[in-house]
């Protein structure tokens, strides 16, 4: 029997908007070995403790402003320090592409097809998206838009359906 290991815990700031909750759900589908924790009234310390108790390596926080996801902060749970910090300057969710979450569920084999963004390489590997085989349910392409600004595009390989786009600034 295969035991699922939690590698990444995903959460948000308190009282997230529907858009932020949807983004967290999509991240949970596309980041292998990840689990979402609802923040609720939990303190940051309680979230860290829960992630450590789950045996996770990373804690990914999505911070929002005016209901829109604005920043992604990834903590290394071994050193308890920030490992990655990105400003989210653009976001298209599955609903923006008329794709339902049910179409995305169960597609856990994520492969990097193209990576033009050096500053995202380690992040993608740490988020368990390093498979370079042809057995991919989802492919990720990263395209350099400007120095330290990159577009990440996620597509279902079965029908070449785009379902998630993020513009990340380092």
From Swiss-Prot:
PROSITE patterns: BRIX. SUPFAM superfamilies: Class II aaRS ABD-related. Residues 6-170 form the Brix domain. SMART domains: Brix. One of its GO terms (biological process) is rRNA processing. Keywords: Ribosome biogenesis. It comes from the Archaea. InterPro entries: Brix, Brix_dom_Rbsml_bgen_prot. GO terms for molecular function: rRNA binding. HAMAP family: BriX. Probably involved in the biogenesis of the ribosome. This is Probable Brix domain-containing ribosomal biogenesis protein. It comes from Saccharolobus solfataricus (strain ATCC 35092 / DSM 1617 / JCM 11322 / P2) (Sulfolobus solfataricus).
């Amino acid at each position: 029997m295969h035991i699922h290991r939690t590698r990444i815990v995903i959460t948000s700031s308190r009282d997230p908007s529907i858009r932020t909750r949807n983004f967290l759900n999509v991240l949970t589908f596309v980041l292998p070995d990840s689990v979402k924790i609802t923040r609720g009234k939990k303190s940051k310390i309680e979230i860290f403790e829960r992630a450590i108790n789950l045996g996770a390596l990373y804690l990914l926080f999505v911070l929002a402003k005016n209901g829109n996801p604005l920043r992604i902060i990834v903590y290394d749970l071994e050193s308890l320090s920030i490992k990655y910090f990105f400003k989210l300057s653009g976001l298209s969710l599955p609903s923006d592409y008329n794709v339902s979450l049910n179409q995305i569920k169960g597609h856990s084999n994520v492969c990097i097809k193209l990576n033009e963004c050096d500053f995202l390489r380690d992040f993608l590997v740490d988020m368990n998206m390093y498979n370079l085989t042809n057995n991919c349910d989802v492919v990720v392409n990263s395209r350099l838009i400007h120095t330290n600004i990159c577009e990440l595009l996620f597509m279902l390989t079965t029908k070449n359906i785009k379902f998630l786009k993020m513009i990340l600034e380092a």
